[in-house]
Swiss-Prot record:
Transmembrane segments: none annotated. Homodimer. InterPro entries: GHMP_kinase_C_dom, GHMP_kinase_C_sf, GHMP_kinase_N_dom, IspE, Ribosomal_Su5_D2-typ_SF, Ribsml_uS5_D2-typ_fold_subgr. PANTHER family: 4-DIPHOSPHOCYTIDYL-2-C-METHYL-D-ERYTHRITOL KINASE, CHLOROPLASTIC (PTHR43527:SF2). ATP binds at P98, M99, G100, G101, G102, L103, G104, G105, G106, S107, S108. The active site is at K9, D140. It catalyses: 4-CDP-2-C-methyl-D-erythritol + ATP = 4-CDP-2-C-methyl-D-erythritol 2-phosphate + ADP + H(+). Gene3D superfamilies: 3.30.230.10, GHMP kinase, C-terminal domain. The gene is ispE. The lineage of its organism: Bacteria, Pseudomonadati, Pseudomonadota, Gammaproteobacteria, Enterobacterales. Its EC number is 2.7.1.148. It comes from the Bacteria. This is 4-diphosphocytidyl-2-C-methyl-D-erythritol kinase. GO terms for molecular function: 4-(cytidine 5'-diphospho)-2-C-methyl-D-erythritol kinase activity; ATP binding. Catalyzes the phosphorylation of the position 2 hydroxy group of 4-diphosphocytidyl-2C-methyl-D-erythritol.
Amino acid sequence: MTHWPSPAKLNLFLYITGQRADGYHTLQTLFQFLDYGDTLHIEPRRDGEIHLLTPVNGVENEDNLIVRAARLLMKAASESGRLPAGSGADISIEKRLPMGGGLGGGSSNAATVLVALNHLWQCGLSIDELATLGLTLGADVPVFVRGHAAFAEGVGEILTPVNPPEKWYLVAHPGVSIPTPVIFKDPQLPRNTPKRSIDTLLKCEFSNDCEVIARKRFREVDAALSWLLEYAPSRLTGTGACVFAEFDTESCARQVLEQAPEWLNAFVAKGVNLSPLHRELL
């Protein structure tokens, strides 16, 4: 049995710069990983079978991103003659990241499967090939595959590695799940934020264009942010529902965590520019 980190991410800022004819939104965002997340346990099989041993409530196994990622890698490696005969896996997950939280849990799970099985099966696909596969599963999967904090443009697929400060964060889940389409279909979502260079953006105060919609439509998000803002700079990650406050030290973050209201599910984690998944491979 092998054990693989599947870390969370934060969007340190998120700006919607337009909407394409196909309905997808163009954006500029800054991804950073957390030293906190799910853990995947993978046992290679020799009979070509893929088994997910820990089903997720409400999601059929074959629809789960974990299984889809495994089958995608199997197909791509087989078609290019790089899949050893009988390659398969038993996969289980220790789930800590909430669904619909904006922490990238499902995308991170898919990326971990692609990276881990490519290693365990010795397929030899490059990071670029894995990232291309990952993009077919979701726009956030490639950043997890590549494993470095990144500035993202386009619909999130154009990645430039960056090294923002590695601060401490108090991350809070307000107890609601926000489907991404709810935010992106809202007519009041800002869709014309001017595009700026990464150098300019890093000098500006960070914000998230989705936050005003999430706070308006979900009172729990509004309440969580109102509480966090009493202590530190705070904002929404992704399209929510999770919110986070940033601190210079772990002790400051934990002091605030001790005062968290009971209705908030919160944790403290460090922002890291190298993914914990990729640290495992060093």
